[in-house]
């Protein structure tokens, strides 16, 4: 195997992820401390993603999908995940299993066709950090139900979109990010 030296271009996504991993926990906890000082209800943080890469119609993750699941584990551990929700498909469960094992948080199964469980999740995990993994056609309805944010559709070859939401505040917020390696259908984070 020939090893190529890292170029500035190939290091950029890693640097962005490291910065995100470093700053995100501080921002979340600063907000929670501020809310407690004011006597307000603590905000609930949500990370909503599509499952990681799979090969064609296969249900298990590819090597790229497993790498993305490992990255999610790092992010979810850094921000102290308190709840994990997944549909009952192998690809969604495999996406969050490394995080569940690292944090010792059980994966709770939800039905992708219904959104009524979101209200119960919100009340059970007030002030917590909830990770939800869905599918290309179910992730955005969850994001919209929680925050009102309407994102462009997720392509069938897009796996790197991550939605960071906060609810329980005066105005729900949503930040759309990209994490890990760029998906085939996604614009590169380090594109010129």
Summary of predicted features, one role per range:
Residues 2-4:
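Cytosolic-side transmembrane helix boundary signature
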Residues 29-126, 139-192:
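Active-site-proximal alpha-helix that buttresses catalytic centers in soluble enzyme cores
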Residues 133-135:
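Short beta-strand segments
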Residues 18-27:
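Bacterial N-terminal signal peptides
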Residues 6-19:
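Bacterial N-terminal signal peptides that target proteins for export
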Residues 129-131:
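Noncatalytic modules at the cell exterior or secretory-pathway interfaces
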């Amino acid at each position: 195997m020939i090893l190529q030296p890292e170029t500035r271009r190939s290091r950029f996504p890693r640097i962005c992820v490291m910065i995100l991993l470093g700053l995100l926990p501080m921002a979340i906890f600063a907000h929670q401390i501020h809310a407690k000082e004011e006597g307000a209800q603590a905000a609930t943080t949500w990370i909503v993603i599509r499952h990681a890469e799979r090969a064609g119609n296969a249900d298990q993750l590819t090597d790229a999908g497993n790498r993305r699941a490992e990255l999610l584990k790092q992010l979810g551990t850094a921000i102290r995940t308190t709840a994990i929700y997944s549909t009952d498909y192998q690809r969604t469960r495999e996406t969050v299993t490394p995080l569940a094992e690292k944090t010792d948080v059980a994966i709770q199964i939800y039905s992708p066709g219904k959104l009524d469980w979101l209200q119960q999740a919100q009340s059970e995990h007030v002030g917590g950090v909830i990770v939800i993994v869905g599918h290309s056609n179910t992730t955005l309805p969850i994001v919209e139900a929680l925050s009102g944010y309407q994102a462009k559709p997720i392509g069938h070859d897009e796996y790197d979109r991550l939605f960071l939401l906060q609810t329980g505040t005066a105005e729900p917020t949503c930040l759309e990010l990209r994490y890990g390696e760029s998906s085939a259908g996604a614009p590169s984070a380090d594109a010129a």
